[in-house]
Swiss-Prot record:
Interacts with SDH1 within the SDH catalytic dimer. Present with 1080 molecules/cell in log phase SD medium. The gene is SDH5. Gene3D superfamilies: Flavinator of succinate dehydrogenase. It holds the Pfam family Sdh5. One of its GO terms (biological process) is protein-FAD linkage. It comes from the Eukaryota. This is Succinate dehydrogenase assembly factor 2, mitochondrial. Plays an essential role in the assembly of succinate dehydrogenase (SDH), an enzyme complex (also referred to as respiratory complex II) that is a component of both the tricarboxylic acid (TCA) cycle and the mitochondrial electron transport chain, and which couples the oxidation of succinate to fumarate with the reduction of ubiquinone (coenzyme Q) to ubiquinol. Required for flavinylation (covalent attachment of FAD) of the flavoprotein subunit SDH1 of the SDH catalytic dimer. Disruption phenotype: Respiratory deficient phenotype: viable on glucose medium, but is inviable on non-fermentable carbon sources such as glycerol. Cells lack SDH activity due to a complete loss of FAD cofactor attachment of SDH1. It comes from Saccharomyces cerevisiae (strain ATCC 204508 / S288c) (Baker's yeast).
Length: 162
């Protein structure tokens, strides 16, 4: 596999990326959160995902955790998810207990588009994993995403998180 793309392999290795040998034996490499493959027979319904292990935080004070989750809710990289999660966090984060904060933290470690599709109940595009099937937090996010008040979504002012 490394002989197929020697210059690319060296470049990606220098940047900390890994070339992964998929089940088909094709070369794959990451550019952000999207994967590219050398296999010309890839089907659109076959998704190769990147999984980066989240940083293990131990004994993180709740005020620091809330501040981090606010930041992570507001700065996702995809506008739709930024707007959805920032509004959700502004409304609910201050009321969450430690267990709910842990669950929300875990949700934020998922891919942006997956979060968006799960929140908008678009399971055909991104199937809901069993891990989230009975999540009260995800159900609350889905309800929030319905925008029953028909408000125009915008990034909440930081004072809304207090």
């Amino acid at each position: 596999m490394h002989n197929m793309f020697p210059a690319l392999t060296k470049t990606l290795s220098l940047q900390g990326y890994k070339i992964i040998n998929s089940q088909t034996g094709s070369a794959a490499w990451s550019c952000g959160r999207r994967w590219f493959s050398s296999d010309k027979d890839d089907h659109d319904d076959v998704v190769t995902r990147i999984k980066i292990a989240p940083i293990k935080r131990t004994n993180e004070p709740l005020d620091k955790k809330r501040a981090r989750l606010i930041y992570q809710s507001r700065k996702r990289g995809i506008l739709e998810t930024d707007l959805l999660l920032s509004g959700f966090a502004a409304k609910y984060l201050k009321k969450m207990n430690e267990e709910e904060l842990e669950e929300y933290d875990s949700l934020l470690n998922e891919l942006d588009w997956d979060i968006y599709y799960w929140a908008t109940k678009n399971f055909k595009t991104s199937p809901l994993p069993d891990k989230w099937a009975n999540s009260k937090l995800l159900k609350q996010l889905q309800e929030f995403s319905e925008n029953k008040e028909k408000e125009i979504l915008s990034m909440p002012d930081l004072s809304k998180y207090q």
